[in-house]
Design a protein with these regions (language model features):
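Long, intrinsically disordered, low-complexity segments
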Residues: 279-281, 287-293, 300-302, 441, ...
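Conserved, well-structured interaction surfaces
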Residues: 87-158, 186-190, 203-208, 345, ...
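Hydrophobic-face positions in mid-chain alpha helices that act as interaction patches
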Residues: 239-446, 451, 499, 549-552, ...
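Short, surface-exposed recognition loops and adjoining beta-strand edges that mediate ligand/DNA contacts
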Residues: 33-34, 62-81, 162-168, 212-292, ...
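Membrane-proximal, proline-rich intrinsically disordered regions
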Residues: 21-73, 486, 530-568
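Bacterial Sec-dependent N-terminal signal peptides
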Residues: 1-29
Length: 568
């Protein structure tokens, strides 16, 4: 234990002690093969340090509070999308990610870059030290290749354009050795090719994990590899990776059962569904600096991030959907229905917070709804078709409510009375996917890859290859677990095609897990953010919005001279 502590201290001290460094000046002699070879378990201790640093608060330019890689990763990967509502302005740098107001000096932008490359350096040390011809080294080498591939993937998806925008676009610097070298931004295609090679080698080297899901395994490497192939539009390869991971097992056999799925994220590190997570222990509770604090209050959290209205409409097509157990509306208990009308932002200030007008519902008993506006006039509520079909209540899965309110087309929601955030007119609807491990509202082991995603990777790949039957088979495994009706080729329940079915199922199943923003960008699909909140009231077109990629951190590009991303 004393030896392990020494190695962890060296590893973490090395990674975190250079908060102002850039890739050119990072010292390559702090931890080397000679040090590793002093102890047979040296590589194991170093890999444990790689996992630990992803959850620890780290110093970046003198600031450590709330500065966790995993927290920042979910801010940067999830908050620019259309699944979240930012309930108000905040001083947390999550605001800039949500509002497309990123700068190269933000701590989340700089910390994630710094920590990712420190982890990559550590994995390179292990890879250069261990003899891969020795069977006893295979597992740890596989872990090192896995983490190197995963870190490069995180960097490539955040700081470079999607692969689907072109292989020759500027990617991120590739680091495949500990040798000092001039920093250049490799093309996107080269970066993805290296990620594939690393994950393939990881899958070949690893077997079962060394412990809980906080340690990667063969299936974790194949799962992330299927994601990478999907992003690269290599659909046959994506399918092959998923089928290799399944190894003949039925897709639904890999999922957490319906009965226990509401507790899945609280128990992620021991669930059979989790392929890799950032494992946390009780001692890792970060309180208000935790990932969960962004989504939940429960006495301690900030609870500033709520589900978006369009996503709520999608869930509410099937109120029995077990996935709604992760959504916690703060009902007031007052009788009667309320109308929540989104007031569009003004053309002169689209960045200003856009709010809801909240009032009581008027129901004439004949299925006609209306409300009284702040001007004293009564406004009719229109049921608008979605996916080509409007259905009557209570089934009603394919409609939204709208109203022409004071000359504006406004999205309307009807619900029981929900407590509003203090000082604002945004209903408080918390999210619990990052909470309640060991009963602690601020503790979880955030999931990086799970079978639910992997099956939907295969579903999308099959659909894009024209194999609708197989695509629906995988989608239906997810929907059956959710406890909601499945699809057939003859009944897509209002959808025009199976691709749209898959994309909405990905949105429902993987909400707030860091996938939706990437899914929309790689497919060049618009994100409609015209709903209440502090995020800009606009449609984000990934083909036109430069800020779908983050800036290269200031302390990197100003020293190494690598090219900054456009728009910064």
């Amino acid at each position: 234990m004393k030896t392990k502590s020494l190695y962890l201290a060296v590893a973490l001290g090395m990674m975190l002690g250079f908060s102002s460094c850039n890739l050119d000046t990072f010292p390559s002699d702090e931890l080397n093969s000679d040090l590793l070879l002093q102890d047979a378990k040296g590589a194991e201790y170093i890999m444990d340090g790689c996992y630990a640093v992803l959850k620890d608060e780290v110093d970046f330019l003198g600031y450590a509070s709330g500065n966790c890689y995993v927290r920042h990763y979910f801010q940067l990967s999830e908050f620019p999308g259309d699944n979240i509502c930012l309930s108000a302005h905040t001083t947390d740098p999550l605001y800039e990610a949500t509002a497309y107001m990123m700068t190269d000096g933000l701590k989340n932008v700089g910390t994630l870059w710094m920590v990712a490359y420190k982890v990559i350096y550590m994995t390179n040390t292990v890879i250069e030290t261990l003899d891969e011809s020795k069977p006893e080294n295979k597992q740890l080498l596989g872990e090192a290749y896995f983490m190197r591939g995963l870190m490069h993937l995180h960097l490539a998806t955040l700081y470079a354009l999607p692969y689907s925008f072109g292989r020759d676009n500027l990617g991120v610097p590739l680091r495949t050795s500990t040798a000092s070298e001039v920093t250049v931004r490799n093309p996107v295609g080269e970066v993805y090719d290296q990620i594939v090679a690393d994950l393939r080698k990881a899958a070949d080297f690893m077997g079962k994990s060394r412990g809980n899901a906080g340690y990667p395994c063969k299936e974790a490497a194949l799962g992330v590899l299927s994601r990478v192939y999907l992003y690269m539009e290599k659909y046959d390869d994506c399918i092959a990776a998923v089928e290799e991971a399944l190894n003949g097992a039925a897709p639904d056999s890999k999922l957490e059962p319906t009965a226990t799925f509401p507790q899945y994220f609280a128990n992620a590190k021991t669930s059979k569904e989790t392929l890799f997570c950032i494992a946390h222990e009780t001692s890792d509770d970060r309180g208000q600096s935790s990932t969960g604090s962004m989504y939940l209050k429960d006495g301690i959290g900030w609870g500033e991030i709520y589900p978006s209205d369009p996503l709520m409409y999608l869930y509410e097509r099937h109120p029995e959907d077990v996935r709604m157990s992760f959504i916690l509306p703060q009902f007031s208990g007052k009788p009667g229905k309320k109308v929540y009308v989104t007031i569009p932002a003004s053309d002169s200030d689209p960045e200003a917070p856009h709010i809801k007008y909240v009032t009581s519902l008027i129901d004439d008993g004949g299925g006609n709804y209306s409300f009284k506006g702040s001007d004293g006039n009564t406004y009719a509520i229109e049921k608008r078709m979605v996916n080509g079909e409007a259905q009557p209540d209570p089934a009603g899965p394919y409609f939204e409510y709208h109203a022409n309110y004071m000359g504006e087309d406004c999205l309307v929601r009807i619900n029981n009375d929900v407590t509003l955030r203090t000082g604002y007119t945004i209903p408080m609807i918390f999210i619990s996917k990052f909470s309640y491990q060991d009963g602690n509202p601020m503790l979880s082991s955030p999931v990086m890859c799970r079978w639910g995603e992997v099956l939907l990777n295969a579903a999308e790949a099959y659909a894009r290859n024209g194999n609708d039957a197989k695509a629906l088979e995988y989608v239906n495994a997810i929907r059956t677990r959710a406890g909601i009706p499945t699809y057939t080729a003859g009944d897509l329940q209002g959808y025009a095609n199976v691709i749209n079915v898959v994309m909405d199922e990905r949105r429902l199943e993987l909400a707030w897990e860091g996938h939706r923003f990437f899914d929309m960008c790689r497919n060049k699909l618009p994100m409609d953010r015209r709903y209440a909140g502090a995020q800009p009231y606009k449609i984000v077109d990934p083909t036109k919005e430069q800020h779908i990629v983050y800036p290269i951190p200031n302390n990197e590009w100003t020293v190494s001279g690598i090219q900054q991303n456009p728009g910064y």
